[in-house]
Structure formats: C-alpha cells, structure tokens
Amino acid sequence: VYKCDLSNQEILDEYMNCDIVSFPSLYEGFGMPIIEGQAVGRVVFTSDLEPMKEIAGDAALLVDPYSIESIRNGVMKLIKNHHYRDDLIKRGLENIERFKLPVIVKCYMDLYTKLEREN
C-alpha cells in the first residue's frame, strides 16, 4: 500500500502495525526506513548494497534486490525462523544506538578535534 504525506505519528503507526520492514531498495542516499524500523523493534530486510549494508550492520537480513528468489527466501526465513527474527530485532535495537544524536555529535567533535590538531 502506497501512502504519502504522512505525519510523523502516522509514520510511527505504520511501523507499529507491521511485522517486517521490507526495504529491498536499489539506490538510497541513507536508508532511513532501516533505522526507523529497528527503532520500533521491527525486523528489517534490505538490500545487500551500500549504503543499506552499512546502515543495517549485522542487524538486518540482507537480500539481493535484483533477485525475486533472494527476496522470497529472505521473507520466508523471517517468517519461519522465530529465533533468527528475534535475534535481528535485538541487534536492531542495539544498532540504532550509533545513530542517536549524542553519538553523532561526539563523532563530529572528535573529527573536528583531530583536524584541529593536524593543522
């Protein structure tokens, strides 16, 4: 179902009403649905392409977005293997920690400090 112009609350509601966040994108600048889904405790499957692999870390099932079979097998694995799904959800909740504002700010401050020392 395609929906547009959703409020932040409506977006959150959509995530909360799903079981699996399906994001087999061919190209993205960042891949917000990955961390949005992980942040609300949903299992995510996404493309085995950058930047999705970097954003997802080891906390999402990666599939070949050009292969219907890979996507189908990924979905079936998430449906049938409860332990694997629960493990990905746990790792997803851990993964989102690196995208929280204080962590990002610290990374930038460390970079600026390093650059200042080098000059």
Residue ranges and their predicted role:
Residues 13-18, 71, 108:
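Short alpha-helical donor nucleotide-sugar binding micro-motif in glycosyltransferases
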Residues 26:
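Aromatic "clamp/platform" in nucleotide-sugar-dependent glycosyltransferases that forms part
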Residues 46, 61-68, 77-82:
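Conserved acidic donor-binding segment of nucleotide-sugar-dependent glycosyltransferases
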Residues 1-7, 14, 61-62:
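Active-site donor-binding acidic/aromatic loop of nucleotide-activated sugar
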Residues 77, 101-119:
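C-terminal alpha-helical cap of glycosyltransferases
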Residues 34, 49-62:
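Short acidic/histidine- and often glycine-rich active-site loop of Leloir-type glycosyltransferases
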Residues 34, 39-46:
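Short hydrophobic beta-strand element within catalytic cores of glycosyltransferases
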